[in-house]
UniProtKB/Swiss-Prot annotation:
It is found in: Cytoplasm. It holds the Pfam family Put_DNA-bind_N. One of its GO terms (cellular component) is cytoplasm. This is Redox-sensing transcriptional repressor Rex. NAD(+) binds at residues 89-94. The lineage of its organism: Bacteria, Thermotogati, Thermotogota, Thermotogae, Thermotogales. Homodimer. HAMAP family: Rex. One of its GO terms (biological process) is negative regulation of DNA-templated transcription. Modulates transcription in response to changes in cellular NADH/NAD(+) redox state. Belongs to the transcriptional regulatory Rex family.
Length: 208
């Protein structure tokens, strides 16, 4: 069994990858953990500790080869693979996700979108993507080898949809519903309102 990596590490790993991408664009060939830390507002020791979960990178006193580290982290994150996704919920969020072109550019291909509203069936949610009946969800996931499910349904239906996705063989879930779901596969919760509350807390705190 693979070593369990703390979730904050995986989130920072994405930040490292994006920072290294910018460094490559700038033509930087070697970078120190101190410079990465400065750019990301972290401690250099934290970066070194995070990377140590995955092996040895760089040389003491020299730094990291930017291209090598970028490729290595990309391999860890699975960026070279094209991931198949389905969206459940063809409301505003579901359609917005389906139309987000950057996802396809980054290796995330939405292959289906589902809803329970008969008035939405057969309508185009995004270019080349029409809404299907949610009753067909499991069959579609199994037949197309879908790996990631995106939940964009009301809170009261999120747990049921998550369980159906898991049973169908989904490997991970991106959850936009404002409720925590409990399944055995990895879940990433995106709660826009909660994030805004954190932001307003910081604003109020700064201005008091």
């Amino acid at each position: 069994m693979a070593e369990k990596i703390p979730k904050p590490v995986s989130k920072r790993l994405v930040s490292y990858y994006m920072c290294l991408e910018r460094l490559l664009d700038e033509g930087v060939e070697v970078v120190s953990s101190e410079e990465l830390a400065r750019r990301l507002d972290l401690k250099a020791s934290q970066i070194r500790k995070d990377l140590s979960y995955f092996g040895e990178f760089g040389k003491r006193g020299v730094g990291y080869n930017v291209e090598h580290l970028y490729d290595a982290i990309g391999e860890i994150l699975g960026v070279k693979k094209e991931w198949k996704l389905v969206v459940v919920g063809a409301g505003n969020i579901g359609r917005a996700v389906s139309n987000y072109a950057v996802m396809r550019e980054k290796g995330f291909k939405i292959v289906g979108i589902f809803d329970s509203d008969p008035s939405k069936m057969g309508k185009e949610a995004a270019p080349g993507l029409t809404v299907s009946d949610v009753s067909e969800l499991e069959k579609f996931v199994e037949e197309h080898g879908v790996e990631i499910g995106v939940i964009a349904v009301p809170a009261e239906h999120a747990q049921e949809i998550a369980e159906r996705l898991e049973k169908a063989g989904i490997m991970g879930i991106l959850n936009f519903a404002p409720v925590k779901i409990k399944v055995s596969v990895p879940v990433e919760n995106i709660d826009i309102t909660a994030s805004l509350r954190v932001l307003t807390f910081e604003i109020v705190r700064r201005n008091n």
